[in-house]
């Protein structure tokens, strides 16, 4: 069945060239997110009407970034920029089905948590040959949040873990979550009249990412220490990844006339290791995309595009790294809309600041 829901990632950017050498930028984006729910009859869905919880395993994660950047342009070629990042995170995870054993019926919910980080980068351009290159580093951001946790299976009378869960839930502590650091490299150059080639390479430090809610962690440690999960004697995480993610996109863009332009691109993503979490059961992807851009006047444009993804096959595991299933032959489609305006004659596009999150 289809377990992935539709979701969108809005992005907005504003750049003001305050003086010949100094600029200010404001960027809003949603760097990470998830929206998925299992349905139908499977080991990820609880259909037993006797139990006090029903439905399918699901995850919803929302993050938002507001970036305030300051740029210094010593000449027409170089741009040095850095700034602060205000980030919010909230999420819901519901585990359902026999796959999760004693965690069947577990709920994890957070309110919106706020934290601050930073980013910095450098850009270089040669306008005469349409060359633009930039490197942007985004630092990790740590969040500490009070989360709601509930172990639904232990509400069943005579459940053997009910006394232990009662002890665990009588205390509480902060749940820590750190969104990963990343590096973006963008490059563009003219290859013939009105035609450019472009490329992007991105690295995300997912191998250090983990989510272990406080009460979830305490129960997992008990299970590991009592040899109930022999391969995890120190407990396990609700979500973690084995490897860092590397992705790349290459393409060609062409200006057909004063009003119309277009592009085609090919993309590849390594994923973050295999096996993967049941809450995001894919290992990377290949993609192809195309887009068009219409400029009714010199000072604004409208762009649209579509991209098709072949999602990588993956073996899914639970937090305890027990086998949960194999996911194969999956795909996805993405649509994009882009609108831009130039407010002054020396206003330049915020490409030098761009950090696709």
Enumerate the predicted regions with their spans.
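Outer-membrane beta-barrel porins/channels
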Residues: 8-11, 17-357
């Amino acid at each position: 069945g289809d377990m992935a829901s539709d979701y969108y990632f809005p992005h907005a950017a504003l750049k003001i060239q305050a003086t010949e050498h100094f600029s200010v930028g404001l960027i809003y984006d949603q760097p990470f997110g998830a929206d998925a729910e299992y349905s139908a009859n499977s080991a990820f869905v609880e259909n037993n009407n006797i139990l006090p919880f029903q439905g399918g395993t699901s995850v919803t994660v929302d993050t938002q970034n507001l970036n305030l950047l300051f740029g210094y342009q010593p000449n027409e070629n170089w741009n040095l920029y850095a700034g602060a990042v205000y980030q919010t995170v909230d999420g819901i995870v519901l585990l359902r089905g026999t796959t999760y054993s004693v965690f069947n019926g577990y709920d994890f919910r957070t309110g919106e948590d706020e934290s601050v980080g930073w980013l910095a980068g450098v850009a270089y351009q040669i306008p005469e040959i349409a060359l633009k290159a930039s490197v942007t580093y985004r630092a990790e951001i740590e969040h500490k949040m009070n989360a709601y946790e509930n172990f639904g299976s232990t509400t069943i009378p005579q459940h053997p873990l009910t006394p232990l869960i009662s002890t665990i839930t009588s205390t509480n502590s902060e749940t820590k979550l750190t969104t990963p650091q990343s590096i973006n490299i963008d490059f563009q150059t003219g290859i013939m009249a009105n035609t450019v080639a472009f490329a992007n390479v991105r690295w995300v430090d997912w191998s250090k990412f983990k989510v272990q809610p406080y009460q979830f962690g305490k129960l997992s440690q008990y299970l590991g220490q009592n040899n109930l999960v022999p391969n995890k004697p120190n407990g396990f995480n609700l979500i973690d990844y084995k490897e860092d993610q590397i992705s790349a996109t290459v393409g060609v863009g062409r200006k057909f006339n004063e009003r119309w332009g277009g592009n085609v691109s090919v993309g590849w993503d390594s994923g973050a290791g295999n096996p993967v979490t049941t809450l995001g059961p894919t290992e990377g992807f290949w993609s192809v995309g195309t887009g068009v851009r219409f400029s009714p006047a010199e000072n604004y444009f409208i762009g649209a595009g579509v991209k098709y993804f072949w999602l990588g096959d993956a073996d899914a595991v639970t937090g305890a790294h027990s086998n949960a299933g194999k996911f194969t032959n999956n795909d996805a489609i993405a649509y994009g809309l882009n609108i831009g305006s130039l407010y002054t004659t020396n206003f330049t596009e915020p490409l030098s600041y761009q950090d696709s999150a």
